[in-house]
């Protein structure tokens, strides 16, 4: 890249909303495995616990963190939480692109709104989008709130859209 003549290692951007790294052990292990395989890894995640830095290079992994303004307790609360997180995650993905660079995006659900960020990078910049499918959100909604209905249907639609946009999925 650039005029230096030095090739950049291929890069992976991982986006996770529900927990910071390295506390999200599954995501952290995936990031470390990618790093060990020779990739440059960037992770976008919320701040949490003692991990409050907006940016840090942690064990060779670039970590970009955003605030999580509140934790939802209702369906409307989840909509607000996920919307604000999505905006932060998109902005930080742009920052990661210019600061570190990446060649593919891996998004970890929930929420099943991350197809918006993944689709942006896929359709406008040709970056493959991989869904790391952690949770079955329509079923979690039903278990948590004891009912189906409008939000359950919306979650099912978002889940299908996420799978449709993804080039591959991990479970």
Can you say where each PLM-predicted feature lies in the sequence?
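A short, charged, and often flexible helix/loop element on the N-terminal side
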Residues: 62-91, 147-151
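Structural motif
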Residues: 11, 103-104, 168
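Membrane-proximal helix-turn-helix segments that form the acceptor-binding/catalytic region
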Residues: 94, 113-116, 120-125, 131, ...
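An aromatic- and histidine-rich active-site surface loop
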Residues: 51, 85-89, 102-126, 130-139
């Amino acid at each position: 890249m650039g005029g230096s003549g030095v090739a950049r290692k291929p890069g992976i951007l991982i986006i996770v909303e529900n927990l910071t790294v390295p506390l999200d052990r599954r995501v952290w292990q995936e990031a470390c495995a990618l790093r060990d395989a020779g990739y440059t890894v960037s992770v976008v995640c919320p701040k949490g616990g003692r991990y409050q830095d907006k940016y840090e290079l942690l064990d060779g992994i670039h970590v970009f963190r955003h605030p999580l303004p509140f934790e939802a307790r209702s369906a409307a609360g989840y909509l607000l939480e996920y919307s604000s997180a999505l905006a932060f995650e998109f902005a930080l993905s742009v920052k990661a692109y210019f600061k570190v660079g990446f060649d593919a995006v891996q998004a970890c659900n929930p929420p099943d709104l991350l197809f918006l960020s993944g689709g942006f990078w896929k359709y406008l910049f040709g970056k493959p989008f991989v869904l790391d499918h952690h949770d079955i959100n329509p079923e979690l909604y039903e278990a948590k709130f004891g009912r189906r209905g409008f939000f359950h249907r919306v979650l099912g639609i978002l889940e299908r859209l996420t799978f449709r946009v993804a080039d591959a999925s991990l479970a």
